[in-house]
C-alpha cells in the first residue's frame, strides 16, 4: 500500500444542468482538484523497492458532458466567477500550489521530489520532478491554430543516480526528511548527476 500525509487537499465540483433541468444528457460537470504538500511512501515492498515522494503538489482539471460524447472545454479556475454558494476560498487554493494557476489548458500537473532504492542498491535515485499534461494550439502544427493538440512536459532537476551493486541513500541525519537525502555510490556500477533534463512531447490529433 501507500502511506502518506497531505497538508491540504482541495476539491471543487460544479454541475451545469444545461438548458433543461430535467435532462441529464445536456449536463456538464467540472472538477478542479489541488493537492498541496504531499509526503508519502510505498509500504510492504521494502525488500524490493523503497519509494518516498516528498514536497509534492498536484492539480487536476476535468470536464465531462452528460451525453458521454461531447468534449466540453475545461474551466479556467483562476478567472472563473460565480454567485450563490461562496467557493472563493476553495477556488483560491486551486491556484496557489507551486504549479501556479489552474487554467483550462491543464489536465494534470505534478511537482515534487522522489527518493528511491530498488533491490537494495541496484538502482538508487533522488531528485525533483515536474510533470504537466494538457493541450496546446499552434499554427505550426498540421491541425492548425484552432485545434487542440495533446502535450506533455517532464523536467527532472538535481538528480543523482547510481546503477550497480551496493548503492544506498544517505539520510544525512534526518530519517523522516527525504528532501536532503543524497545518493551514495556502491562498490561497482555507474554513478551520475543531472542538473536538468527536459522532455516535451506533442501529439497532434489531426
What are these regions (language model features)?
Residues 1-206:
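N-terminal low-complexity, acidic/Ser/Thr/Gly/Pro-rich segments
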Amino acid at each position: 500500500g501507500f502511506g502518506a500525509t497531505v497538508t491540504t487537499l482541495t476539491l471543487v465540483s460544479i454541475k451545469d444542468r444545461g438548458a433543461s433541468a430535467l435532462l441529464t444528457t445536456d449536463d456538464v460537470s467540472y472538477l478542479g482538484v489541488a493537492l498541496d504538500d504531499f509526503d508519502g511512501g510505498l509500504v510492504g515492498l521494502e525488500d524490493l523497492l523503497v519509494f518516498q515522494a516528498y514536497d509534492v503538489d498536484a492539480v487536476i482539471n476535468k470536464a465531462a458532458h452528460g451525453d458521454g460524447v461531447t468534449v466540453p472545454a475545461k474551466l479556467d479556475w483562476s478567472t472563473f466567477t460565480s454567485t450563490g454558494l461562496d467557493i472563493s476560498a476553495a477556488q483560491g487554493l486551486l491556484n496557489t500550489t507551486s504549479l501556479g494557476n489552474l487554467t483550462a489548458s491543464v489536465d494534470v500537473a505534478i511537482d515534487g521530489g522522489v527518493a528511491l532504492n530498488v533491490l537494495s542498491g541496484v538502482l538508487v535515485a533522488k531528485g525533483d520532478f515536474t510533470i504537466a499534461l494538457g493541450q496546446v494550439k499552434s499554427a505550426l502544427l498540421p491541425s492548425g491554430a484552432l485545434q487542440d493538440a495533446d502535450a506533455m512536459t517532464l523536467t527532472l532537476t538535481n538528480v543523482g543516480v547510481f546503477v550497480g551493486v551496493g548503492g544506498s541513500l544517505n539520510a544525512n541525519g534526518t530519517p523522516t526528511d527525504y528532501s536532503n537525502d543524497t545518493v551514495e555510490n556502491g562498490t561497482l556500477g555507474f554513478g551520475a548527476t543531472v542538473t536538468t533534463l527536459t522532455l516535451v512531447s506533442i501529439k497532434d490529433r489531426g
